């Protein structure tokens, strides 16, 4: 599994001084699962991935079925936050 971080997401992660990040399923919708990104220690069964000086813990159920995750940051009029794109599809958090 590969993790990609866009320039906007990397800048925001630097801005908030984020480390030890965990990616997990936060719920399910019509188009599939929603993923969350939060600071936290790895949990039992997580896959740990180092990328650009950061440590990411990814839930095993995600790592087993996803080829790559792209972490992006969106800032708009009504909302802002990290967006996780999986295999070319998106999920917001």
For each predicted feature, which ranges?
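Domain-level signature for proteins that mediate thiol-based redox and metal-cofactor handling
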Residues: 1-93
